[in-house]
């Protein structure tokens, strides 16, 4: 069983530092494509000031030189969903569960185990980079598929941006969860609350040591419970009354 979550733009560079892993050839190819930009071009590419682009340029150079500080992916990414995952003071058993079952999807490093060491960077699949003449999604598709190859159970807590990197054959095997609130008899999806609920789902799965996705249906997560009457085979609805 694999649980897929997306990377985040917000980063916590106060996280613990770990030993760097060798960069994959794909990651090097992307970094070299970014390195080819002038400072002005990089600022335009990212949609940021040249002052901030200089920070990114320094990060790119440090990564290629092997001198960048690296942090566990699960602890470096710090968006709302990540802040809603229990990450501090975990037992060895809890960390082992996350390392075995949780995969983090990124545009620079591909698909990562929870505690893989990575460096701060700025890149997502909406950016118009063409490593090896391909879009970022096309560039990573084969590696993304290989990351879950042979897995019978795949739970996607991904946004469509990241999910679409996988081939159609893999996407058709994924189970997705939607978190909906009952507001006066109308079911609504709230982006912020959904992000928090996805983080709470990761925590609940870790605490309960879930390895069979069917067992999710008996969980209550941040006030959300499974609704069989609203769910489909591959789309499970959790409702907060």
Ranges and model annotations:
Residues 86-233, 237-241:
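Internal, well-folded beta-alpha domain core
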Residues 2-89:
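Active-site helix-to-loop segments that bind/position phosphate- or nucleotide-bearing substrates
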């Amino acid at each position: 069983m694999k649980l897929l979550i997306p990377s985040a733009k917000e980063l916590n560079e106060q996280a613990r530092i770990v030993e760097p892993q060798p960069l994959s050839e794909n990651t090097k190819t992307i970094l070299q494509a970014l390195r080819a930009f002038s400072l002005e071009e990089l600022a335009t590419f990212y949609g940021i000031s040249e002052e901030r682009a200089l920070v990114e340029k320094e990060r790119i150079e440090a990564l290629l030189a092997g001198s960048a500080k690296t942090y566990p992916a699960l602890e470096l990414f710090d968006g709302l969903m990540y802040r809603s995952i229990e990450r501090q003071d975990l037992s060895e058993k809890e960390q082992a569960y996350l390392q075995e079952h949780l995969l983090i999807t990124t545009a620079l490093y591909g698909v990562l185990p929870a505690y893989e060491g990575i460096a701060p960077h700025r890149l997502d699949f909406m950016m118009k980079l063409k490593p090896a003449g391909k879009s970022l999604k096309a560039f990573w598709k084969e590696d993304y598929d290989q990351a879950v190859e042979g897995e019978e159970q795949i739970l996607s807590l991904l946004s469509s941006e990241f999910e679409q990197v996988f081939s159609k054959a893999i996407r058709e095997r994924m189970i997705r969860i939607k978190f909906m609130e009952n507001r006066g008899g109308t079911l609504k999806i709230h982006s912020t609350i959904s992000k928090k609920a996805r983080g709470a789902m990761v925590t609940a799965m870790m605490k309960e040591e879930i390895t069979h996705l069917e067992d999710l249906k008996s969980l209550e997560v941040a006030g959300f419970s499974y609704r069989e009457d609203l769910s489909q085979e591959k789309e499970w609805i959790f409702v907060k009354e």
